[in-house]
Amino acid sequence: MIVKSLHENIGISIEGIDLSNLDNDTFQNIKKLWLEYLVIVFPHQNISDEDHIKFGKRFGKLEVHPSLSHRSSKNPEIYRVSNVDENGDIIPNKETSWQYLKQSWLWHTDSSFRKIPSNGSILHGISTTNKGGNTLFANMYKAYEDLEESMKQKIKKLKVVHDHKFIISLSDELSKRKNKGNYDKLDPVIHPLVRKHPSTKKSSLFLSPHTMVKIHDYDDSEGRELLDFLIEHSIQSKYVYKHIWNNNDVVMWDNRCTMHSVEPFDNKTIKRIMHRVTLIGDQKPIMA
């Protein structure tokens, strides 16, 4: 197993292993490194969806995403983060399913709209592009750690309202039509703005701009200004690793201490096919 650093504050790559055939010692080592480095890139992994699911289940149960149009028809645990349908055709720009996925171009944390958000995500790049479509990952431990002490005191007991419907409101195309899937069936949830990781016990900012409606019990305009400040602070280059995809890269990240986004690409002409499994969270976020 060959381990290489990808960024001074976040991310490693691991080569020389086969994710479809891991012994327990290697898996336990990967799990330990994941908690330490937050993001792991596994290059050259020509795995099937079944292999992908099997690897994900070694970390725990897997989510089934509420969006019906993005689930694999064969394996519902596979979330198709793709601008291509299951017949291999590019999804038209105005289609609901693409407009929903386009919101991943915003910074976010997977499943922040759930009462118990996900522990992590594992993404397989099946057909990638070198013309955009890179994924950015931010270290939210470090972003919190570097805040001035006065700001830490200001935000440590604050809570944020997250709502899945907020994703819909960000797109005119989604807002004006009856949406597919179960978009409207999830109630808003409230999460701490600063959370403690259940395994590492470290504190981090918990931000997810595509679902964050407001700070709970806080002046709306002041709350939005504060959230915007924290977002901009967290996405400075010193906290962010940019992953430039190659076909058959597998990337996993810890949603409890990272935030991520996708760089835009020409979705009308380029096929970007990505499959994700998402690790079900095992407890509500802990206030730091």
Kindly label every feature range from the protein language model.
Residues 2-252, 256-288:
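Fe(II)/2-oxoglutarate oxygenase catalytic core
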